[in-house]
Amino acid sequence: MLGINNEDCFNTIQKIQDQGRKVGLVLTSPPYNTGRNSTDIKRRDTHEARYDIHLDNMTDSEYLDWTTALFHGFDNILRKNGVVLYNMSYGTDTTNTKEDYKPNEIMYKVINRVITETAFTIADTIVWKKSTALPNNTSKNKLTRLCEFVYVFVRKSELKSFETAKKVKSVAKTGQKFYENVYNFVEARNNDRTNKLNKATFSSELVLKLLDMYYTKGVVYDPFMGTGSTGVACEMLGIKWLGSEISTAQCEYARKRLEEL
């Protein structure tokens, strides 16, 4: 099962569970459900289409239920003291004119749902400063977005024992350990390369920095592999990895990237 699996992540998670396997770290960026995509063919052919086949337009209720099920799946396959690194951001869709449309709320609703209805809580929040800002030229009151967030989820029962890659810097005579400073601020490129298949990818540079902070052992799993940035970074470090991706075209794109390494 290692490598890219061209299937829904829930199928992959079930297979991992059925085989009695565990992953050491989950690192991913899910669809944000910003509603930019549409079943309208004219809209799908514009810049608003973020993915080649996924319609990023669930209702908030559907998206929250979907996220809850996803984290229940993570709980079933993540090893003891493992970590979930979950990149999310708020919406920027200004094309939706419905009065009740509030794109900024969904990220916080997701966090609330995860910490109240699953085994996980937030241990840390990493600010990812991108090299290129995302403009808001069509908005008179929204600021230009330069950062996204990576939420560090761990099991509530493991909040004091979950593992990071922080190294011991010194040990006092009393036995007290002092660790190196690892800051919750990361600067990395937006993505590795632009493509029409997925306009919401993160860069392998970001993945490399996150792995340096949190990877300790085991297989890294990305349930939304996209064009392969997580796999590329893991290959560069000699780390075993596993990914799921529903788009056949994106899987082929990722495999070609990996062959170029």
PLM feature spans:
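Core catalytic lobe of class I
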Residues: M1-Y253
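Short, conserved SAM-binding/catalytic segment
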Residues: R255-L261
